[in-house]
């Protein structure tokens, strides 16, 4: 992995969301790649239950500001970034007020899936692709997890 550029895309990641199999694997795999000399960047949604202040997220103005079309509607794309403590790995957060402001990831308090999870997933995927283009960074490997 030495010198390889790896784009790691995940729906969940420790320490930003509670620990589970997906969030922990999405932390450990990039950490190992990074420690072996890979150049890794992680992308995940900026769910409303992620504490921006505690995790020091900040908006990247040069990457934000475009709209993505989802179901014939223009939806603003906001990009935020933070670093995983002690790992020197950048995490890019795909954000949109309509899709990600609620204080949960996939389900409501009763355990019901949000009816727009499909639109949220499409917005996230499009947001990752557009942001990588704007970064002018071409990964050698793209890994999508969770």
Regions found by a protein language model. Give the residues of each.
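Short amphipathic alpha-helix
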Residues: 22-32
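Structural motif
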Residues: 5, 140-141
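A conserved catalytic-core segment of Leloir-type glycosyltransferases
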Residues: 42, 46-134
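Short, surface-exposed connector motifs at secondary-structure boundaries
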Residues: 134-140
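Hydrophobic anchor at the start of a short beta-strand
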Residues: 38-40, 91, 139
């Amino acid at each position: 992995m030495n010198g390889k550029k790896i784009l790691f895309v995940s729906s969940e990641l420790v320490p930003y969301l509670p620990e589970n199999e997906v969030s922990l694997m999405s932390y450990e795999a990039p950490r190992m790649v990074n420690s072996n000399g890979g150049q890794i960047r992680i992308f995940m949604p900026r769910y409303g239950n992620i504490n921006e202040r505690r995790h020091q997220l900040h908006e990247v103005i040069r990457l934000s500001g475009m709209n993505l079309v989802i179901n014939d509607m223009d939806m603003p794309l906001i990009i935020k970034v933070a670093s995983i403590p002690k790992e020197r790995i950048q995490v890019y957060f795909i954000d949109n007020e309509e899709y990600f402001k609620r204080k949960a990831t996939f389900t409501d308090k009763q355990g019901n899936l949000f009816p727009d999870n499909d639109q949220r997933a499409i917005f996230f995927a499009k947001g990752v692709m557009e942001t990588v283009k704007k970064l002018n960074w071409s990964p050698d490997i793209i890994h999508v997890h969770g």
